[in-house]
UniProtKB/Swiss-Prot annotation:
Binding site for ATP: 11, 59, 87, 93, 104, 114
HAMAP family linked: NDP_kinase
Keyword Magnesium recorded: yes
Sequence similarity: Belongs to the NDK family.
SMART domains attached to this UniProt entry: NDK (SM00562)
Organism for this UniProt entry: Synechococcus sp. (strain WH7803)
Active-site residues from the entry: 117
Gene (name only): ndk
Keywords: ATP-binding, Cytoplasm, Kinase, Magnesium, Metal-binding, Nucleotide metabolism, Nucleotide-binding, Phosphoprotein, Transferase
Protein name: Nucleoside diphosphate kinase
């Protein structure tokens, strides 16, 4: 499987609850490479663009209000199959349906405060990475243990 990138965001509830290290650690232990990281409080414009697919849904305003309510940790992770694997690490959108061992299964109980966002497809990842990061904010590097992470 070819290396790909995904966008992951720790939402304001995850930041406020002190879960940044726990979540970062899960991605690092899995073997993915962090290529972009920043903390910011998103503007309404950024939030509306990010959640644009939900613009006509009744919960859109609540999503925008929540994601702009405090700091978010925005990240770009890279690795073989990272998009699908990250979705498995994150767990179901509704935390009460998320499996134990997943981020949401272990750390969240309410859909409106589900701690983390992850891109769901390559096209979404590309859009979200471009929305949240400038190309100059992403690092292209090779971990010293790369040979121990993947074959070939």
């Amino acid at each position: 499987m070819a290396s790909e990138r995904t966008f992951i965001a720790i939402k304001p509830d995850g930041v406020q609850r002190g879960l940044i290290g726990e979540i970062l650690g899960r991605f690092e232990r899995k073997g993915f490479k962090l290529v972009g990281l920043k903390q910011l409080t998103p503007s309404r414009e950024l939030a509306e663009q990010h959640y644009g697919v939900h613009k006509e849904r009744p919960f859109f305003a609540g999503l925008v209000d929540f994601i702009t309510s405090g700091p978010v940790v925005a990240m770009v992770w890279e690795g073989d199959g990272v998009i699908a694997s990250a979705r498995k690490l994150i767990g179901a959108t509704k935390p009460l349906e998320a499996e134990p061992g997943t981020i949401r299964g272990d750390l969240a109980i309410n859909i409106g405060r589900n701690v983390i966002h992850g891109s769901d497809a390559p096209e979404t990842a590309q859009f979200e990475i471009g929305l949240w990061f400038q190309a100059s904010e992403l690092s292209d590097w090779t971990p010293s243990d790369q040979g121990w992470r993947t074959e070939g």
